[in-house]
């Protein structure tokens, strides 16, 4: 705390610097301070004067600068609390996840430049090295995970998709949506499919289209299993592709209908125009009549074929229109009725698919699984009926009279089940599980093919390593909606892992792959130099 006024500081400085001999002692007595204080005041006053008039920043300027720096420092601290730490390991994680989601290398580079700035962002070559390491690491991780999944993959939906004329063999477990097979192969022959499928020894049922190579591979797998005293896998023909072929034929027929209809309308406009001009329409009305006859004939043919298909389509459903459980005998009866009515070369493929015994394998499998529940036949039929009635119930928002009637019928059937067995709920859950998990179409693998097509549109090419990275990401990705919400495919399949996090599974192997890549690069450079 200052006890001596500044005036005495200046007087003390004057006595010390320019005063005669004895001035310091006299001024110390006048200011009531010690001689040392006089010397200190002289030093401080001299320094203050030199600082003020020495050509440097003034005191006011220094104070203003300090205040500005303090404000800047406070702002930087506020920004620091809002920033995200983004070290090199985080950048590698970002790259691996983005590539797994289908983002291209160039897009990853742009996003990292936005986050880090153009100068701090890694180069494209660096990102490419990370991508290669992540793909190799994913292959190592998947080799272990596939081994753990083999006991749990009992049903598979199989298909192939082409990228740059090279097939990718795809297999998906439909209930969990685990992508268990994603192999970029040189061909799609039966031997190639067999080499990939024979590792999945727990497969009991597969569904696919009628592709020659795929069917040959499944047949070879069945022969191998019989020769080694294993239970041969059941094979079902995909209902989805059968329906798609029917819709293709019907669309072609409808295009003919539209073309003839347009010609008939054009003929009618020509006749009407001549009438308006006062010209004779003799001969033109006959052409108009013939045009409409052709259009009507083609339209009626389309309606007949469509009606035939709507009836035979019911043979490919789990339940008949009356709510009874479908079976092979009834389904084949509907097909036998429809075949003569689907004549013509354009329907040849549809007829061949419908006549294939494997089109109704799912019905045989369904009845076998229900029989294995060991329930009384009356109770089993009642529970199956209850499940079907529950599927017919409208949504809560649909408060219609028909909805009320259906709800009443369902309640009556429920009471009937309770009278048959007071402990009916547990049996119902078992029956519902069988009905709910019936697989008659390879929609799951078609879903996966759609994802792969989307990814292919963003990448120049899908390498085997990149496919492995995408497969690992898909199988560890948590579903955000639908009946699988909240869990990833591996969890739905029942595979027990220490963690299901994509980066946690990949990180260690990716660092090892990066280290190995550096060693290989040094070895290559040394060889070139030598």
List PLM regions with ranges.
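Inter-helix linker motif
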Residues: 223-255, 259
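Short alpha-helical "recognition helix" segments of helix-turn-helix
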Residues: 23-32, 108, 112
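Short, solvent-exposed alpha-helical "recognition" segments
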Residues: 39-58, 129-140
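C-terminal domain-tail junction helix/linker
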Residues: 303, 310-314, 377-389, 395, ...
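Mobile genetic element proteins and their domesticated derivatives, centered on retroelements
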Residues: 12-13, 27, 38-41, 95, ...
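Short, amphipathic alpha-helical "recognition" segments used to contact nucleic acids or chromatin
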Residues: 2-22, 84-103
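RNase H-like nuclease fold core
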Residues: 68-225, 252-256, 267-270, 282-291, ...
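Active-site proximal helix-loop segment of RNase H-like, two-metal nucleases, encompassing DDE(D)
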Residues: 49, 252-270, 434, 444-462, ...
């Amino acid at each position: 705390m200052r006890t001596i006024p500044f005036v005495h500081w200046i007087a003390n400085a004057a006595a010390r610097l320019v005063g005669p001999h004895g001035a310091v002692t006299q001024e110390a007595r006048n200011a009531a301070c010690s001689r040392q204080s006089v010397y200190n005041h002289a030093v401080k006053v001299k320094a203050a004067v030199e600082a003020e008039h020495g050509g440097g920043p003034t005191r006011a300027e220094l104070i203003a600068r300090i205040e500005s720096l303090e404000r800047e420092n406070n702002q930087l601290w506020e920004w620091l609390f809002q920033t995200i730490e983004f070290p090199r390991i985080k950048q590698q994680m970002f790259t691996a996840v983005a590539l797994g989601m289908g983002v291209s290398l160039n897009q990853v580079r742009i996003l990292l430049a936005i986050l880090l700035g153009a100068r701090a962002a890694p180069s494209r070559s660096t990102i490419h090295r990370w991508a290669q390491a992540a793909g190799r690491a994913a292959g190592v991780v998947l080799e272990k995970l596939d081994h753990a999944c083999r006991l749990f993959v009992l049903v598979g939906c199989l298909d192939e998709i082409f990228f740059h004329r090279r097939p990718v063999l795809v297999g998906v477990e439909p209930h969990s949506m685990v992508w268990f097979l994603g192999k970029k192969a040189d061909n799609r022959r039966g031997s190639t499919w067999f080499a990939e499928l024979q590792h999945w020894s727990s497969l009991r049922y597969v569904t696919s289209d009628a592709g020659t190579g795929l069917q040959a591979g499944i047949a070879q797998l069945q022969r191998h299993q019989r020769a080694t005293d294993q239970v041969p896998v059941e094979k079902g023909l995909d209902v989805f592709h059968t329906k798609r072929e029917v819709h293709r034929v019907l669309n072609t027929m409808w295009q003919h209908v539209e073309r003839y209809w347009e010609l008939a309308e054009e003929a009618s406009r020509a006749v009407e125009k001549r009438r308006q001009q006062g010209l004779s329409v003799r001969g033109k009305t006959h052409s108009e009549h013939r045009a409409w006859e052709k259009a009507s004939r083609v339209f009626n043919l389309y309606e007949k074929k469509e009606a035939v298909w709507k009836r035979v389509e019911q043979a490919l459903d789990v339940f008949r229109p009356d709510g009874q459980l479908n079976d092979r005998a009834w389904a084949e009866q509907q097909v036998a009725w429809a075949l003569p009515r689907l004549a013509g070369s354009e329907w040849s493929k549809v007829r061949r698919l419908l006549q294939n015994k494997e089109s109704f394998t799912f019905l045989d499998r369904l009845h076998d699984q229900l029989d294995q529940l060991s329930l009384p036949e009356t109770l089993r039929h009642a529970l199956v009926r209850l499940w079907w009635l529950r599927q017919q119930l409208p949504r809560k928002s649909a408060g219609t009279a028909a909805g009320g009637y259906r709800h009443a019928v369902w309640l009556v059937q429920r009471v009937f089940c309770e009278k048959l067995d007071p402990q009916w709920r547990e049996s119902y859950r078992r029956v519902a599980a069988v009905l709910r998990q019936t697989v008659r179409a390879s929609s799951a693998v078609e879903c996966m093919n759609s994802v792969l097509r989307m990814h292919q549109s963003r990448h120049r090419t899908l390498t085997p390593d990149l496919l492995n990275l995408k497969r690992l990401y898909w199988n560890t990705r948590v579903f955000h909606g639908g009946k699988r919400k909240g869990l990833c495919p591996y969890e739905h399949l029942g595979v027990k892992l220490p963690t299901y996090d994509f980066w946690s599974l990949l990180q260690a192997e990716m660092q090892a792959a990066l280290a190995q890549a550096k060693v290989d690069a040094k070895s290559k450079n040394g060889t070139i130099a030598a």
